[in-house]
Amino acid sequence: MFDYSIFSKELENLKEQGLYTYIKTLESPQGAWLTINGKKVLNLCSNNYLGFANEERLKKAAIEAIEKWGVGPGAVRTIAGTFSLHNELEKTLAEFKKVEATIFLQSGFVANQAVIPAITNEEDAILSDELNHASIIDGVRLSKAKRYVWKHRDVKDLEEKLKEAKDARRKLIITDGVFSMDGDLAPLPEIVELAEKYNAMVMVDDAHGEGVLGSHGRGIVDHFGLHGRVDIEIGTLSKAFGVLGGYVAGKKELIDYLKQKARPFLFSSPLSPADTAAALEATKILQESDDRVKRLWDNAKYFKEEMKKLGFDTGESETPITPVMLYDAKLSTNFSKELFEEGIFAQSIGYPTVPKGKARIRVMISAVHTKEDLDFALEKFEKVGKKLGVI
């Protein structure tokens, strides 16, 4: 019989290093406040940027979709699993993103694994920022293309790698739009310039930019005014959109090609009618108004400024993502536990999600937080920070 004790030993090692992830179970919907183990806590760690996860319009749309379409698609999309509702979501997303077409998949993670191996192979070169998301890294591995990893946000190093890859059949530059652990932005205008100079494609994973950056939350491409110059945009429907799923946005030819070649599209069922309808409603709300996006930024600005006044190191974030840098993994884990006791749910982030020695509490601000919520958080951060000798 297989000896499972090897896993037990590995788990003990993780605990000793302060790297073991303790999973808390929610007993309430997503929102500014959560109930966990019967305790009401302020939520500072979800990706529910705009509060859509428990938005009445989205819930109503999901319920109506279940009544009309049922609970599941029943097949993959190429056989009998494409509803007109699915097509409507893709059309509306394309209008929102100002692209020719989109294709949605089961998650943002899956979207990266769908597109990268579909458009590259061993004859090609992929140039990837060293801090790109795990889903990009896995997608690159699946493609079998030659990989060139460039220093984080360093366009000079990217150019050197492009020169090294000059003989590749096809060159694909991939970057996160917003880097989820630090909140910094990709230098997308400079990347696009290099891509045009060296005849490369540009792909940006905008999971943390959608609903956050650009007009009405259209994302980093809109933020920099680069419509038509970025070949592939990867989006998620599970963060600012508050639902589930991911999608690829770009030229019609690309999207049509993916519908023939992307394995997760061909061999896995699509989103349920409820998820599809809710995501569609979220897109419509963003098209109508950017009030929530503005509230998100106002909240983030206030919280960051006050945290810096208290003496916390909040890194170099350019977005509502606020890393509270503690560096030591055990300190970060203890800080998170102390915050929870004080009524704040803010998770510690350590290796392998971030490099060793870069542990932090990643604070995720939402449009649904009130000033009173933020002041409560600041009070508790100050208390715990002083108790643990951080400030």
Curated annotation (Swiss-Prot):
It comes from Thermosipho africanus (strain TCF52B). Keywords: Acyltransferase, Biotin biosynthesis, Pyridoxal phosphate, Transferase. Pathway: Cofactor biosynthesis; biotin biosynthesis. NCBIfam families: bioF, gly_Cac_T_rel, PRK06939.1. This is 8-amino-7-oxononanoate synthase. It comes from the Bacteria. GO terms for biological process: biotin biosynthetic process. Substrate binds at residues 133, 353.
